[in-house]
Amino acid sequence: MNNPYIPFASRILDVKKHTQKEYTFRMEYHGEVKPGQFFEVSVPKFGEAPISVSGIGDGYVELTIRRVGRVTNEVFENYVGDSLLMRGPYGNGFDISIFDHGETLVVAGGTGVSPVRGVIEALAASPAAADTHVIVGFRSPADMLFRPDLEEWKDKLDLVLTVD
């Protein structure tokens, strides 16, 4: 078992640009992780930042990062094939099976959609999809994240999308 307090190198498998400031980094990761958990991403000599898991797949996690400070500026200077240091995952995450009975409401806006994206994905693929209501908002069309996911979610869930 890996020690979540010891940093490990994780290779960048893919980078997806959403806006000028928000990118999703697909990071190599072979451990267990649940929707709602986060990693500490560190850049030597610059520091570390807690980044929520925005997607989970076989052999990877996705971290959607907004470029807002020293650490995230340095993260954005890395490309596919480069490695970043990570610690974690931290937090309890969500046991999606508890949502199988009764209605569920998920509300998120802007970059706050990132931490619940994995939860929404899991709910959309579960028996709870018919009873799941999602309200997502963004400041403007240019600020919208996860456009393909939004299209998919509206076919599986009760999705309300607001753009100011």
Task: Report each predicted region and the residues it spans.
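FNR/FR-type flavoprotein reductase catalytic core
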Residues: 70-164
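Ferredoxin-reductase
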Residues: 1-82, 138-140, 164
